[in-house]
Amino acid sequence: WHSNDRYRRTVWQCTRKYHDEICRTPHLTEAQLRGKVVSAMQRLSDDRASVLRTAESIRDSVYGTSALQDELEQVQRDLAAQAEKLNRAIRTNASVAQDQAEHQQKMKKLTARYQALQERYQALTEEIQGRDSRRAGLNSFLRQLKKLPETVTAPDAITLHVLIERITVNADRSIVIRFRDGTEVVERL
């Protein structure tokens, strides 16, 4: 508002303000929002030891990939064995006269099994990548939390981005600040 004069200020408002139903959430100035974020981050800093313990246990138990890696290796071995069976069936068909209907039936089964293994391999790979990505995000959160000063005054943009996942303003004038470790802090306007 007042974009070209000395009274300029940034106001945050709901993105659904002009839809069919008018949104009842309050407008916030940059200063109000920053104050509530600093307050929430101070509460997080005060409870740092507990948050670090919880987040590290989550990181190791939920985002661990060793069991998935073992299963992925087994699926890779099964894929190689299944590919060899397919190649053997093709070579046998080329060198030995046999009933083609029976051969086609056998090839369908072998191919279906191979495709199922490929799908499982793909699913495991995606799950491992997702867990690794979430683990890396949690590691960044933990590093940034350890760097957070005892008294939070004015956090920089990188700290805000790494620590905060989402900020929700409700119609009852409460602000829910969700940190990347799942912790939520509720502030009042």
Regions found by a protein language model. Name each.
Residues W1-L189:
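Amphipathic alpha-helical coiled-coil/heptad-repeat segments
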